[in-house]
């Protein structure tokens, strides 16, 4: 009963701070501070400084700003236009037509970005005008973008997997490799849904595409070569053991700069904008991770994680039952918090439960990302829905309905 009282206290302070407009990272530190003051005699200030510094100076964490910077650089190149020109000849003859470019484009860009928002914005600004001009159903255009953009959370280099790995001190490279196949399977399922919908829908009447010969398709595919080389360098260097995740991220930044320069889109303005964009995003995530580290330490002093793990053990839940409970919990949490915040907020309590149940932490990381992907397109806080609303000027209810399938 005492454990539930502590949980209620932590949740009350957390939602009080978040409801007051305090940043998530600072709110986590505030909750941890209250816990340390009430349940320990340790000097809170010294503990907080030491914990925040340790969390912020982690070598593993250096991969995060580098991958974000790589995505920011590519966002400001002509990569999206080139991808559409390279993919559209191959997608046009499939059931569902050019809507598949949303899915394949998001899959490809996710492999060089790691950010769901960057993937959505980059592919969306290219595909939405083109698909509208060809009279594809608006709900399908928006729905496939909303869903496929979440692949940026699964396919390496995924920022969510990096944050998860840093939070539980797990190998980033192993998490990346584990995310490749599930990401491709999800992309295939999205494409299957589009193909089936195009055959049964009565509103599907796009403008026919001109037929191209095989040689013409191959010629247009040359626009995909730069991004495929970059993907091979970043992912291949990790897979073959030539580089760690951080070193691969550095290769990605260099490759992104070279790609931008070769396209003539690299100048001081784009360079500084990409650097500042990456700095802002990285600082936000680093603050959340620092707050989560302090909160984890505070919870450790209270004995809450171990107490909850023992309680779960007393309930004698099977692995499947535990996963179903956590699935419902994260779906509800995802309605109010973004994916990264959901991960760092809960891992201090959830990780001991998972270890106690004997569930592999790499597998559970992929499970969490799939649920977080749902949160990205779940009202009222689904971030992808807000991005799409700004791009299409549709009502939030319309976009949410389009994203349901």
Regions flagged by a language model, labelled:
Residues 1-405:
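Alpha-helical transmembrane segments of multi-pass membrane transport proteins
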């Amino acid at each position: 009963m005492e454990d539930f009282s502590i949980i209620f206290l932590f949740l009350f302070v957390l939602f009080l701070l978040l409801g007051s407009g305090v940043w998530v990272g600072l709110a986590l530190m505030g909750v941890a501070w209250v816990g340390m003051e009430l349940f320990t005699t340790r000097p809170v200030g010294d503990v907080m400084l030491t914990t925040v510094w340790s969390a912020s100076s982690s070598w593993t964490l250096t991969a995060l700003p580098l991958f974000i910077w790589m995505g920011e650089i590519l966002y400001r190149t002509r990569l999206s236009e080139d991808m559409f020109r390279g993919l559209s000849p191959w997608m046009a003859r499939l059931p569902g037509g050019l809507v598949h470019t949303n899915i394949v484009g998001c899959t490809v860009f996710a492999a060089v970005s790691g950010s769901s928002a960057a993937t959505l914005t980059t592919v969306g600004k290219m595909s939405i005008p083109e698909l509208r001009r060809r009279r594809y159903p608006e709900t399908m255009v928006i729905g496939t973008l909303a869903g496929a953009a979440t692949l940026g959370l699964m396919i390496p280099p995924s920022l969510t997997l990096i944050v998860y790995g840093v939070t539980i001190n797990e190998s980033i490279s192993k998490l990346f490799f584990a995310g490749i196949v599930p990401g491709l399977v999800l992309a295939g399922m999205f494409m299957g849904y589009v193909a089936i919908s195009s055959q049964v829908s009565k509103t599907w009447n796009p403008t026919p595409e001109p037929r191209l010969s095989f040689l013409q398709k191959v010629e247009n595919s040359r626009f995909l070569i730069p991004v495929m080389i970059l993907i091979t360098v970043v992912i291949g260097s990790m897979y073959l053991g030539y580089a760690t995740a951080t070193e691969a991220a550095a290769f990605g930044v260099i490759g992104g700069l070279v790609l931008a320069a070769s396209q003539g889109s690299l100048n001081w303005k784009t360079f500084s904008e990409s650097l500042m964009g990456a700095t802002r995003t990285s600082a936000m995530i680093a603050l959340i991770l620092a707050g989560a580290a302090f909160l984890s330490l505070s919870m450790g002093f209270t004995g809450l994680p171990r107490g909850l793990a023992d309680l779960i053990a007393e309930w004698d839940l099977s692995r499947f039952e535990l996963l179903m409970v956590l699935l419902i919990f994260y779906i509800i949490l995802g309605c109010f918090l973004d994916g990264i915040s959901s991960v760092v907020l809960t891992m201090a309590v959830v990780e001991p439960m998972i270890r106690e149940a004997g569930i592999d932490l790499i597998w559970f990381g992929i499970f969490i990302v799939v649920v977080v992907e749902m949160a990205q397109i779940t009202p009222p806080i689904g971030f992808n829905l807000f991005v799409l609303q700004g791009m299409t000027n549709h009502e939030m209810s319309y976009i949410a309905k389009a994203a349901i399938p």
